Amino acid sequence: MKNLKTIKKTLFICSALSYGLVLAQEKSWTDGLKLSGSADVFYKADFSGKNNTLTSFTAPNNSFELGMFSLKLTHNTGKFTTTADIGIGNRAEQFNYNESDSKLLIKQLFIDYAATDKLTITAGSWTTHVGYELLDAADNDIYSMSYAFSYGPFFHTGLKANYLIGKFNVMAGVANPTDLKSSFGKAPDGSDYKNKFFIWQVGYAGDKLSAYLNGQQGSYNPVSSNISQFDLTAAYKFTDKFKLGVNATNVTLSDDVASGKQNWSSLVGYLKYDVTDAVALNYRAEYLDNKDNVLSLGAPVGNTVFANTVSATIKSGAFQLKPELRFESSSEDIYVDKDGNAKSNSANFLIAAVYKF
């Protein structure tokens, strides 16, 4: 009888130790795990009754639309951190316009190695360093997108290194041609892209001022075209309530066979004023120079566009409501009126609901 009690006690102790070990292992694993995400939906109406939107993600007219559900997981172990960022919906599909199948879901997938407290090496696929605006609606002050964002790079897949020098940083890397998760068999003739792009950034992040000079250069070999992009983003916080942002980008396309170069550029200004902790007012003004007609914006000749967006963000906990009015005018008739006739200006109203966790 004593032996039976001893056996039971031993089994109980072993079970308790095993359970404690499992809990310790689980706690150790979950300690390095972070989970975040967002979801957004919107309604947009063009005042002409026609779709006159020429930028990303908000084209449908007079329609309730699903934006994107996003789920981001990061896990850290020592000097290594892995990030998996998954998106489902219209934004994710347009973001991954070159991809198909399961790659449509992958916004970001990369591994960071903190070689020192100043040097970080990253391998995988990540959203671009170029530009002021971001893919996720919850991370932008204004829901609709600028031309600079819509026709600039979305993401890069490759290898990069970032080095911190006080408040400055220097980043350099090599990547597949813009917006390609893989360069294998992706050329127009079904062959492989043979060259990699060079990507880089020099940045400063101060208490009130932040500024980043960004770029990408590369060849689309075996295609004869090449691209060079220089981009500047900056933000200045005048007070705790008032912020100014600027984005200037210039893209030059050249060809190894044909002579001459083509260019497009954009200058964007952003103003944000926090009325209260729950309400912010936003304004964006953009001047797009598409005189070489690189972007083919609804006309057989080149044009310029001046776009103005007035927006508000109303917050309640994790929820955001974003109403906006957008007005555009062009040097050419790139929009249409209610009868389908070409015209040189457009306007629309949009309201979006965003939840971030």
Positions of predicted regions on the chain:
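A broad helix-preferring feature
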Residues: K2, L21, V268-Y270, A280, ...
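Bacterial N-terminal signal peptides that target proteins for export
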Residues: K2-L11
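Beta-barrel outer-membrane channel/assembly domains of diderm bacteria
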Residues: C14, L21-I121, L159-G166, V170, ...
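A short hydrophobic/aromatic micro-motif that marks alpha-helical segments and, especially, helix-coil
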Residues: L23, A92-E93, L180-K181, P222, ...
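Surface-exposed coil loops of outer-membrane beta-barrel proteins
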Residues: A24, F42, F47-S63, A92-Q108, ...
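Transmembrane beta-barrel outer-membrane domains
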Residues: T30, A59-L66, S100-I106, S150-F154, ...
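Active-site-proximal loop/turn and secondary-structure-junction residues that shape catalytic pockets
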Residues: I88, T127, N176-T178, Q217-S219, ...
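Detector for outer-membrane/organellar transmembrane beta-barrel domains
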Residues: Y193, W200-P300, F306
